[in-house]
From Swiss-Prot:
CDD domains: LbH_THP_succinylT. This is 2,3,4,5-tetrahydropyridine-2,6-dicarboxylate N-succinyltransferase. GO terms for cellular component: cytoplasm. One of its GO terms (molecular function) is nucleotidyltransferase activity. It is found in: Cytoplasm. PROSITE patterns: HEXAPEP_TRANSFERASES. It comes from Shewanella oneidensis (strain ATCC 700550 / JCM 31522 / CIP 106686 / LMG 19005 / NCIMB 14063 / MR-1). Its main location: cytoplasm. Pathway: Amino-acid biosynthesis; L-lysine biosynthesis via DAP pathway; LL-2,6-diaminopimelate from (S)-tetrahydrodipicolinate (succinylase route): step 1/3. Substrate binds at residues 104, 141. The lineage of its organism: Bacteria, Pseudomonadati, Pseudomonadota, Gammaproteobacteria, Alteromonadales. It catalyses: (S)-2,3,4,5-tetrahydrodipicolinate + succinyl-CoA + H2O = (S)-2-succinylamino-6-oxoheptanedioate + CoA. It is an enzyme of class 2 (transferase). Belongs to the transferase hexapeptide repeat family.
Amino acid sequence: MEALRQRIEAAFEARTDITPSTVDERVRSDVQHVINMLDKGELRVAEKIDGLWHVHQWLKKAVLLSFRIFDNAVIDGAETKYFDKVPLKFAEYDEARFKAEAIRVVPSATVRKGSFIGKNTVLMPSYVNLGAYVDEGTMVDTWATVGSCAQIGKNVHLSGGVGIGGVLEPLQAGPTIIEDNCFIGARSEIVEGVVVEEGSVISMGVYIGQSTRIYDRETGEVHYGRVPAGSVVVSGNLPSACGKYSLYAAIIVKKVDAKTRSKVGINELLRIVD
């Protein structure tokens, strides 16, 4: 694996000289191998090790190289044809394979090859970009999008119209991460490498990027780029120092543990008690 990483790194440094017609066959093979392993979930752009998320930048480089290496090609779809460099993940699936992997894909859902979809997932008409990792038992609801290299945990619910930001460039940027057992409410956007930690509930219409203030009303703490585990978050505002205006913020209204979540429905958790 180290040799593969080094070859990808070297090819990326020389990427300006690479085209579909000039690429070395070893480089083409290496990049395709990485895409295939991402597709199977054998590799992932980010993984949690000893409680901390680690980003494998060389895998992002392989994904970027794929755009320089592969030509556009006609892709058959249910209602139309497409013309793109990246094939569709399920193009060669048959009934037996769908059943074996326990994946339900509703018509017009689009998943690009190089993204991993875990068992017992449901994909409503939605979009999953390459490099993404969607773990077991997750629901990606209608018009939700999972961006490039985003990491979605087990038993997550991405509600209708949710946007999970992608990241390929700049290379140093970490992917957006939604940890296990989270609920992301309709039309919310989580972007720019924000991490939503395990068991959190994000209400409808909440927008969180790296510069968004995430205010804990119980403690007065302000977080950036991270929603602490077990948070229930709604959209709100915080006053300016001068008191003349207010600016948008995400507000942590309460914390819940797994035991509470198992007994109380999502709608109950989102009811604010003043």
